[in-house]
Swiss-Prot record:
4'-phosphopantetheine is transferred from CoA to a specific serine of apo-ACP by AcpS. This modification is essential for activity because fatty acids are bound in thioester linkage to the sulfhydryl of the prosthetic group. This is Acyl carrier protein. GO terms for biological process: lipid A biosynthetic process. The gene is acpP. Pathway: Lipid metabolism; fatty acid biosynthesis. Carrier of the growing fatty acid chain in fatty acid biosynthesis. Gene3D superfamilies: ACP-like. It comes from the Bacteria.
Length: 77
């Protein structure tokens, strides 16, 4: 597991209060991890802070799974 992947998963665990075992790469924030719209906004803000990057709203809407978050961060580092 890459450093970025682990950091993304740590942010997800912290923000959504879920067990680390539930945070698989294919996990959907809403369908699998029980996030609501406010949770997803806060999750994006936490990812921005963790990685020092800005995620525009139109991009944030597309980040619906753990893997998509990892891919976004990797391509914008």
């Amino acid at each position: 597991m890459s450093d970025i992947e682990q950091r993304v998963k740590n942010v997800v665990v912290e923000q959504l209060g879920v067990d680390e075992a539930e945070v698989t790469n294919a996990a959907s924030f809403v369908d699998d991890l029980g996030a609501d719209s406010l949770d997803t906004v806060e999750l994006v803000m936490a990812l921005e802070e963790e990685f020092g990057t800005e995620i525009p709203d139109e991009e944030a809407e597309k980040i619906t799974t753990v893997q998509l978050a990892i891919d976004y961060v990797k391509s914008h580092q």
